[in-house]
Swiss-Prot record:
Residue stretches of biased makeup (Basic and acidic residues): 92-102
Family classification: Belongs to the eukaryotic ribosomal protein P1/P2 family.
Gene3D superfamilies referenced in this protein's UniProt entry, alphabetically: 1.10.10.1410
Species the sequence originates in: Arabidopsis thaliana
Signal peptide per UniProt: none
Function: Plays an important role in the elongation step of protein synthesis.
This protein's UniProt keywords: Phosphoprotein, Ribonucleoprotein, Ribosomal protein
Gene: RPP2A
CDD domains for this protein: Ribosomal_P2
Name the UniProt record assigns to this protein: Large ribosomal subunit protein P2z
Length: 115
């Protein structure tokens, strides 16, 4: 990841195609070490490609990866643009809050440590 970040910094600083030395200089300025093979692999993969195209391709790949948890529900209701989708998540959060309150009261099990 640090090699990719250094590559992006080099491109954003005005170098159209950064070299291994450019990336090593950036990483060296913050005391980060990396293997030459990692830098060479990155430069080989991005050679001749536009930065905007690389970012767009990365976004497409990330969008295709499923994310765990309830995040998909929120995205689906937010992107659906439907009228009634907003009420359901609010109702669910109220139910969860009530459950949490009940669990907290059960923690003492009927006695106090300080009595």
């Amino acid at each position: 990841m640090k090699v990719v970040a250094a590559f992006l910094l080099a491109v954003l600083s005005g170098k159209a195609s950064p070299t291994t030395g450019d990336i090593k200089d950036i990483l060296g300025s913050v005391g980060a070490e990396t293997e030459d093979s990692q830098i060479e692999l990155l430069l080989k993969e991005v050679k001749g490609k536009d930065l905007a195209e690389l970012i767009a391709a990365g976004r497409e790949k990330l969008a295709s990866v499923p994310s765990g948890g309830g995040g998909g529900v929120a995205v689906a209701s937010a992107t659906s643009g439907g009228g009634g989708g907003g009420g359901a998540p609010a109702a669910e959060s109220k139910k969860e809050e009530k459950k949490e309150e009940k669990e907290e009261s059960d923690d003492d099990m009927g006695f106090s440590l300080f009595e």
